């Protein structure tokens, strides 16, 4: 027994034995306070039985109630004024054709140009003058795609009848007569012969006309001089003069004749605005600016149409920015679309019918340049002409923006 107590003392553990009575008394108390008590121990370990009384948690405070969201019952009403930008410059107005009271014999004339906004900015203001559509005819029988030939085959050897058909059947605003017979490499027709053809066309139709040359700088100069004299007072457009004429020294002759007899000059350059400005500067020496129309070159769909669009758009914006050398109406030879083989050649069945593909090719070419700012179009296929005139009419009748309908721009149907 002594050994056991000794062992317990060596281990450092002390057991305090209390009687049952004392334990009962202690059970009724929540705390015990000892006075004059000393304890010498080497190591003290306290084991506390979990108390039955838990520390009370703080009382949760309810957050203040958020005010109820008020849902809008009406749309915010605010006045909207469409922005209208003013431009410092504008395109000059050019008159094509002359009526009897003006010294000519046309039943009507067309004012082209005059734009003071980018093309068809209807939300700013409608175009001053609607674009004009001319139909191409030729003074000799020329090879044409079947899709075109089938409509004009019966009149291809008679320029006057061809012009009549263009006006009476296909509703052309203007007729273009191309004098290909004057080409030295084709028939080399004389200026007098060419002038006679133009006279016949003037007598056959009463709309303004455009007279096209053969592209030879020397021959065109002679032909235009003669035609200007024969068509005195009719205010025809001579198509076209070029920088090649200036370099060949033949520009002065047709330009002086145009001024003397009251005609227009079509200034042709190939997709280069600097050249267009240079040619215009040279023409200013002979004719007033109000007699000049620009042809900046029309490249067909698939053959550089995007370049033509860019050049025409740049020319319009330059005119609005007050560049006087580019403030001239612009003409597009949209018939050039037929130079694209894809417009008429035989392809796979998925590209048929060719009779529809060709007119679409010409129409798309023309509409793109319409939106770039072209004022007058040379076209050929009757369906393309009809579609183009309808597109122009639809754009013109859209009217200005209606601010009161801004909120109704979309509807949903389920």
Give names to the regions the model predicted.
Residues 131-137, 173-177, 207-213, 234-241, ...:
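Hydrophobic faces of well-ordered beta-strands that scaffold small-molecule active sites
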Residues 10-14, 21, 350, 384-390, ...:
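C-terminal accessory extensions appended to soluble enzyme cores
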Residues 143-148, 171-201, 205, 211-217, ...:
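Glycine-rich, proline-tolerant flexible connector loops at the mouths of alpha/beta enzymes
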Residues 244-391:
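Catalytic alpha/beta core domains of metabolic enzymes, predominantly
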Residues 2-153, 407-414:
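N-terminal amphipathic alpha-helix/helix-capping segment at the start of soluble metabolic enzymes
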Residues 167-170, 198-204, 225-232, 252-261, ...:
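Acidic (Asp/Glu)-rich catalytic clusters
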Residues 15, 19-22, 26-38, 132-161, ...:
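Active-site mouth loops of central-metabolism enzymes
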Residues 155-167, 223-224, 360-368:
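Short, acidic/polar
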């Amino acid at each position: 027994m002594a050994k056991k107590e000794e062992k317990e003392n060596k281990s450092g553990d002390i057991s305090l034995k209390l009687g049952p009575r004392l334990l009962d008394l202690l059970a009724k108390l929540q705390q015990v306070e000892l006075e004059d008590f000393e304890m010498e121990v080497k190591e003290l370990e306290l084991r506390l039985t979990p108390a039955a009384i838990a520390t009370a948690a703080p009382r949760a405070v309810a957050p203040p109630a958020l005010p109820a969201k008020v849902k809008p019952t009406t749309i915010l009403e605010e006045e909207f004024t469409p922005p209208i930008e003013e431009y410092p410059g504008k395109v000059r107005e050019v008159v094509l054709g002359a009526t009897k009271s003006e010294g000519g014999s046309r039943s009507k004339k067309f004012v082209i140009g005059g734009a003071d906004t980018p093309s068809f900015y209807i939300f700013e203001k409608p175009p001053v003058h609607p674009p004009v559509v001319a139909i191409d005819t030729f003074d000799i029988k020329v090879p044409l795609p079947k899709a075109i030939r089938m409509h004009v085959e019966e009149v291809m050897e008679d320029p006057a009848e061809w012009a009549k058909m263009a006006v009476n059947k296909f509703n052309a605003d203007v007729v273009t007569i191309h004098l290909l017979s004057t080409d030295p490499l084709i028939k080399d027709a004389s200026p007098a012969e060419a002038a006679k053809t133009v006279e016949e066309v003037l007598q056959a139709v009463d709309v303004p006309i455009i007279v096209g040359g053969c592209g030879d700088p020397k021959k065109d100069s002679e032909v235009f001089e003669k035609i200007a004299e024969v068509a005195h007072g009719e205010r025809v457009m001579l198509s076209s003069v070029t920088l090649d004429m200036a370099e060949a020294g033949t520009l002065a002759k047709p330009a002086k004749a145009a001024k003397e007899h009251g005609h227009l000059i079509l200034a042709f350059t190939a997709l280069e605005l600097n050249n267009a400005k240079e040619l215009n500067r040279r023409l200013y020496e002979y004719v007033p600016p109000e007699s000049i129309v620009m042809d900046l070159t029309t490249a067909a769909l698939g053959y550089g149409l995007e370049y033509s669009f860019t050049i025409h758009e740049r020319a319009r914006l330059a005119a609005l920015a007050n560049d006087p050398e580019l403030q001239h109406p612009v003409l597009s030879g949209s018939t050039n679309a037929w130079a694209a083989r894809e417009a008429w050649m035989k392809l796979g069945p998925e590209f048929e019918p060719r009779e529809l593909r060709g007119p679409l090719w010409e129409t798309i070419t023309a509409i793109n340049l319409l939106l770039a700012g072209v004022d007058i179009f040379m076209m050929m296929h009757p369906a393309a002409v009809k579609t183009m005139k309808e597109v122009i009419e639809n754009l013109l009748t859209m009217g200005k923006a209606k601010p009161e309908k801004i909120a109704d721009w979309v509807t949903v149907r389920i």
